[in-house]
Amino acid sequence: MQTFIHGGGRLPEAVDAALAHYRHQIFVGQLGWQLPMADGRFERDQYDRDDTVYVVARDADGAICGCARLLPTTRPYLLKDVFAPLLMRGVPAPESPGVWELSRFAARSGASRARGARPDWAVRPMLASVVQCAAQRGARRLIGVTFVSMVRLFRRIGVRAHHAGPVRCIGGRPVVACWIDIDASTCAALGIPGASVVPGPALQ
């Protein structure tokens, strides 16, 4: 798995199409999400903007095998606009340059689906790239909505992940707003050197 970062303007057309198709495969095809802006092949929404930061993973054949979307909470973002009821009662959605939203996170590989393979085989390196990318942009915490099972996986890896609100059932599965602390413990668990803020390669 090799990860690429894009955070400067619109995605290149070929990358945009490949990423939207991968997201449709994962979030619509596999997870069965009912997303109003998804068509028969591609998944995009109003948060895919010029200021959106993308982390994209490719396998040895160049095919996309992971993705993540990072949004500054100082601009409109998914949790604040759509999922604010998932936060603790009376707690406003964060608006801070030190907090970024993580959404559309996915990671898979042929090896990770092999019998006996650990489920974090693909998640850990993908999340490491996401955390490092966000930290480079001033983030000290990430927030997002995810499955409760994913929070447990993050914790097993050693990431400082904790609930930002109550568990709710959406689409038949328990989901929760989740904080990820970008601290020494999380960086150590993900194999990120403490002072490592070296930008990754740009998407081509």
From Swiss-Prot:
The keyword Ribosomal protein does not apply. It holds the Pfam family Autoind_synth. Its EC number is 2.3.1.184. SUPFAM superfamilies: Acyl-CoA N-acyltransferases (Nat). The keyword Flavoprotein does not apply. It catalyses: a fatty acyl-[ACP] + S-adenosyl-L-methionine = an N-acyl-L-homoserine lactone + S-methyl-5'-thioadenosine + holo-[ACP] + H(+). GO terms for molecular function: N-acyl homoserine lactone synthase activity. Gene3D superfamilies: 3.40.630.30. This is Acyl-homoserine-lactone synthase. The lineage of its organism: Bacteria, Pseudomonadati, Pseudomonadota, Betaproteobacteria, Burkholderiales.
